[in-house]
Curated annotation (Swiss-Prot):
Record GO biological process: antiviral innate immune response; apoptotic process
Keyword Endoplasmic reticulum in annotation: no
Domain of life: Eukaryota
Organism of this sequence: Homo sapiens (Human)
Modified residues (Phosphothreonine): T70, T447, T533, T590
Protein name in UniProt: A-kinase anchor protein 1, mitochondrial
Region (PKA-RII subunit binding domain): 344-357
Lineage: Eukaryota, Metazoa, Chordata, Craniata, Vertebrata
């Protein structure tokens, strides 16, 4: 709005000023005729009062500057004027009505109407009265003689108009006669007299006594009377404007018309006397100075004009301010609208968030209520068989503060506690059975290790009554009982390994009804709990892959550790696809659920484990968007299904299926229909029945290639010529850090089994490393007298002598990564001749040249012990330095071409 006003204002202002000037011009022009006639009347009065005796022009006195010059004869007393005017003859009254139109045509510069003017007798008295009113009126209508106005200046007299007037006048047919006693004024004098009258407004010479002058002025007086009757008095402003115009056009005034010579004797004496009498009376009255009045009027008019212009400017400014105020108001309204929109958006967002949160809470509450109701119903359906198990657990396992019914725990179970939702069990199967927890005291602490185990072997369930077996009746080999993928060995006070087998019996069903979080570390218990550990049931029920359950007792405790423990189970799916695999005890929950779902004797239920390889490009389709397809498979088949990633393998992933034979077959059938190109062969294999981990062959080491220069870093230095290096550019190197983290999480918890005694040489184990870390190590020597062993760190290098008790058994999945530390010897370098070992100075120099930098190594040959001999270079800027030669040049070693070969 303000911008439009600013653009229109400069255009509108000149237009307004032009319009005002046009109006002012025409208003002044309209008053031109009346002001001119008034001046003519004044000039006629001066001629009537002129002294006939004065023949020569008198000096002009500037009474009114810039306007007119007044002769001294104008100020003569009226008596003298009467004596001069009384001699004039009278003129017929018809002259007063016929001659003024001619003079009006001359003053206006327009040709008069040539039609004859009708004589109107009887108007002489009225005309004289009007003349008297015009001459003797108030000061506003009278023209002072001291400063007469020069109206004739601005009038152009044309000869044509004069001739027309002469022809139309009734006196044009009268022969011109010279009145006795009145000499005829020559044309030159008359023209000069008229010029003086036109510029000064009064005649200052003696020629004023001429009859034609008196006639002319009388006619002008008649015309002035008529104009006064119409205009009711001219304004001073118009007179002043005409005066200015007269001054500017004075050079264009034509001389007096010589042809107008009238007979003085025809003038009526009565008219002249009455006119002279009235003029004398008007002269007798004192007139105020016109100069002061005009100056005041001009000042007032200027002030009025200035005030008008100021008022207009103020009005324009006010309009501008109003426009600006309107713009500000519109901006404020826009801002208020934006603020309101933001408030509405915020309120809508809050309402939507509140509705979503309330709906989520309602769904969760409904789910928890259904699960709790189902658990309570299942617990009520359980008969005396369950009650016979409860007292035993409360007396032998559970403490007084933990003897709460399982239903109370189930009531607070979270939705993801592994319990099936209503409608999930397979068709035709009875309601699942719920059992009282035997391991409640073992799960009293929160979880610390959330790394789940994926692979597991088949497990059959045994009755909880087996827990009543006294601890002294346990077999001698109970210390090395096999554990499943979710079992952890517990340590007794005598540091004897007593594994806790949690899978047999109804005790495993506690994980399906308990609301507590599952964890590997939660199975750690007191010696009292370990004393009642039951033995494995002797059963010969075969697995689906032909392995007998009875063979489990011959397996070592280490074999229960699967290679998929640290794998990522999500595979891009949501937590629903994972169900209960977020802890070490997830297997037992599924087993108990499937056993209860089958509705058969737990002793006769087999758990089938089926694993298939899934190419990487099919993993996303198998999981589905947000895990929907995996969830569909689990709900439809009733089996436990999840996707795991094999460590250090990116091309394929493993689909793990657990459940009964019926559930597994149904899941495989659904998968085979969707993925016809997928190989459904079971790749799962149970652990080998070995008591101890065999020593790994040298192929498990990541060795340096022969004859090829590779980039290495030195991770450990035995001496100046004996080093351990890592190939930090190898594809498997990045997995070492992840392996270190997983080993730290696993072995920092208590209850991990130690190495069996006697310790076998070359066995791989987990040993404490630097800064509390756990590293992979190999036993290279044993000292039975001190119960110590010497180990070699297979990833970070170095030798160390430690107690056997500090070593721990290593899980099989922790040894799948090739050993990253390569043991090497410097080629062609040997200690000085007097020493069998390198000096400390040589060791320090070697450490300085190889520390915290990447080096280039190349295998040249092998030592008699099988260690590779290498040439080692360091790159300093653009210079490559051979470290082998540098040691010799510094005098810290000697160069021998075949030192290790001669040994």
């Amino acid at each position: 709005m303000a911008i439009q006003f600013r653009s229109l204002f400069p255009l509108a202002l000149p237009g307004m000023l032009a319009l005002l000037g046009w109006w002012w011009f025409f208003s002044r022009k309209k008053g031109h005729v009346s002001s001119h006639d008034e001046q003519q009347v004044e000039a006629g009065a001066v001629q009537l009062r002129a002294d006939p005796a004065i023949k020569e022009p008198l000096p002009v006195e500037d009474v009114c500057p810039k306007v007119v010059s007044t002769p001294p004869s104008v100020t003569e007393p009226p008596e003298k004027e009467l004596s001069t005017v009384s001699k004039l003859p009278a003129e017929p009254p018809a002259l007063l009505q016929t001659h003024p139109p001619c003079r009006r045509s001359e003053s206006s510069g327009i040709l008069p109407n040539t039609t004859d003017m009708r004589l109107r007798p009887g108007t002489r008295r009225d005309d004289s009265t009007k003349l008297e009113l015009a001459l003797t009126g108030g000061e506003a209508k009278s023209i002072p003689l001291e400063c007469p106005l020069s109206s004739p200046k601005g009038v152009l007299f044309s000869s044509k108009s004069a001739e027309v007037c002469k022809q139309d006048s009734p006196f044009s047919r009268v022969p011109r006669k010279v009145q006795p006693g009145y000499p005829v004024v020559p044309a030159e004098k008359r023209s000069s007299g008229e010029r003086a009258r036109e510029t000064g407004g009064a005649e200052g010479t003696g020629d004023a006594v001429l009859g034609e002058k008196v006639l002319e002025e009388a006619l002008l007086s008649r015309e002035h009377v008529l104009e006064l009757e119409n205009s009711k008095g001219p304004s001073l402003a118009s007179l002043e404007g005409e005066e200015d115009k007269g001054k500017s056009s004075s050079s264009q005034v034509v001389g007096p018309v010589q042809e107008e010579e009238y007979v003085a004797e025809k003038l009526p004496s009565r008219f002249i006397e009455s006119a002279h009498t009235e003029l004398a009376k008007d002269d007798a009255a004192p007139a105020p100075p016109v100069a002061d009045a005009k100056a005041q009027d001009r000042g007032v008019e200027g002030e009025l004009g200035n005030e008008e212009s100021l008022d207009r400017n103020e009005e324009g400014l006010d309009r501008n301010e109003e426009g600006l105020d309107r713009n500000e108001e519109s901006l404020d309204r826009n801002e208020e609208g934006l603020d309101r929109n933001e408030e509405i958006k915020r309120a809508a967002f809050q309402i939507i968030s509140q509705v979503i949160s309330e709906a989520t809470e309602q769904v969760l509450a409904t789910t928890v209520g259904k699960v709790a109701g189902r658990v309570c119903q299942a617990s009520q359906l359980q008969g005396q068989k369950e009650e016979s198990c409860v007292p035993v657990h409360q007396k032998t396992v559970l403490g007084p503060d933990t003897a709460e019914p399982a239903t109370a725990e189930a009531a607070v179970a979270p939705p993801d506690a592994g319990l099936p939702l209503p409608g999930l069990p397979a068709e035709g199967s009875p309601p699942p059975k719920t059992y009282v927890s035997c391991l409640k005291s073992l799960l009293s602490s929160p979880t610390k290790d959330s790394k789940p185990n994926i692979s597991a072997h088949h497990i059959s369930l045994a009755s909880c009554l087996a827990l009543t077996t006294p601890s002294e009746e346990l077999p001698d080999r109970a210390g090395i009982l096999v554990e499943d993928a979710t079992c952890v060995t517990c340590m007794s006070d005598s540091s004897q390994s007593v594994p806790l087998v949690a899978s047999p019996g109804h005790c495993s069903d506690s994980f399906s009804t308990s609301g507590l979080e599952d964890s590997c570390t939660e199975t750690s218990s007191s010696p009292r709990d370990k004393a009642i550990t039951p033995p494995l049931p002797e059963s010969t029920v075969p697995f689906s892959n032909g392995v007998l359950k009875g063979e489990l007792s011959d397996l070592g405790a280490e074999d229960g550790w699967t290679m998929d423990a640290e794998a990522d189970h999500s595979g891009g799916s949501d937590r629903n696809s994972m169900d209960s695999v977020d802890s070490c005890c997830s297997l037992k929950k599924t087993e108990s659920f499937q056993n209860a779902q089958a509705g058969s004797n737990p002793k006769k239920v087999d758990l089938i484990i089926w694993e298939i390889e899934v190419p990487k490009h099919l993993v996303g389709r198998l999981i589905g968007k947000q895990g929907r397809y995996v969830s569909f498979l689990k709900q439809t088949s009733g089996a436990k299904i999840y996707i795991s990633t094999l460590p250090y393998t990116q091309s394929v992933q493993i689909c793990h299926i657990e459940g009964s034979q019926h559930h597994v077959d149904k899941a495989l059938n659904l998968i085979g229909k969707k993925f016809k190109e997928l190989n459904l062969t079971n790749i799962y294999a149970p652990p080998l029945p070995s008591l101890a981990l065999p020593s790994l062959p040298m192929t498990s080491w990541l060795m340096l290639p022969d004859g090829i220069t590779v980039e290495v870093i030195v991770v450990n230095q035995v001496n100046a010529g004996h080093l351990f290096v890592q190939q930090h550019t190898h594809p498997t190197f990045h997995a070492l850090r992840s392996l270190d983290q997983q080993m730290y999480l696993c072995y920092s918890q208590p209850g991990i089994p130690t190495l069996p005694t006697p310790v076998e040489i070359t066995v791989i184990c987990a040993a404490p490393g630097a800064d509390g870390a756990w590293w992979r190590a190999q036993v290279v020597a044993s000292y039975e007298e001190t119960n110590e062993v010497e180990i070699r760190y297979v990833d970070y290098g170095g030798y160390k002598r430690v107690k056997v008790d500090v070593l721990r058994q290593i899980r099989s999945d922790f040894v799948t990564l090739p050993f990253q530390g390569a043991e090497v010897l410097l080629d062609s370098v040997m200690p000085l001749s007097d020493d069998d070992q390198f000096s400390p100075e040589a060791d320090a120099a070697m450490s300085e040249m190889t520390g915290n930098t990447a080096l280039l190594a190349q295998v040249t040959s092998y030592s008699p012990t099988g260690l590779p001999l290498i040439q080692l270079w360091s790159v300093v800027g653009d210079e490559v330095v051979l470290i082998n030669r540098s040691l010799v040049e510094r005098g810290l070693a000697q160069w021998v071409d075949s030192y290790y070969t001669s040994l």
